[in-house]
Amino acid sequence: WDVAKRLLQHERNMIAGMGLGGGGSAKKKKDQVITSGMATMAKTYAGERNGKLADPALRQKIASFDINSHAFSLTMKRASEESKSSNSGPSPASSMFKYYGSESNKLRYELMLEAMGTKALGWEGEGFGPAELAITREWLRTKANSIEGGTSEVQLNIIAKRVLDLPQ
């Protein structure tokens, strides 16, 4: 059982990275903030005004997402370094990372769909480009993130019991 729990912790850490956009695999220079790139993509669909995304509400949502993603990335990095220095392996905090990562990944694709407008409605056929179809399908795929590695509800229970030490 201990081995199975440890494997799930590693799986949750991997899934958590998806909320960063591609498992956190983007290359960056030291101290460089990587944004989601959604603002650039949104300008293509929603237009731009004075070099900014024309829709101020969508612009605010994307900026908020990028800020939260950067904070999450730094938190995961800090937890990873703490884990390495103590040689303790993944902690119950992996449930927090998995939960937040899967929710963040869903939000990322929902924002892309919002930016794409009616171009996000396609499944196949003319009128939709390959990238648009891929984003729509990936959005549907994000729903599985809240199931794999333990459902979001299970993660919240683990967080309540093992991280926050709340009574049952």
Map each language-model feature to its residues.
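Glycine-rich phosphate/cofactor-binding loops in nucleotide/flavin-utilizing enzymes
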Residues: 1-21, 119-168
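Glycine-rich beta->alpha junctions and the first turn(s) of the following alpha-helix
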Residues: 1-73, 145, 161
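Short, well-ordered loop/turn and helix-capping segments at boundaries between secondary-structure elements
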Residues: 6-13, 44, 68, 77, ...
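Short coil/loop linkers at secondary-structure junctions
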Residues: 48, 52, 89, 119, ...
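Secondary-structure capping and boundary motifs in well-ordered enzyme cores
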Residues: 54, 64-68, 89, 93, ...
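C-terminal helix-coil-helix/basic helical segment that borders enzyme active sites and/or dimer interfaces
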Residues: 56, 70-127
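Short alpha-helical basic/polar micro-motif
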Residues: 60, 99, 158
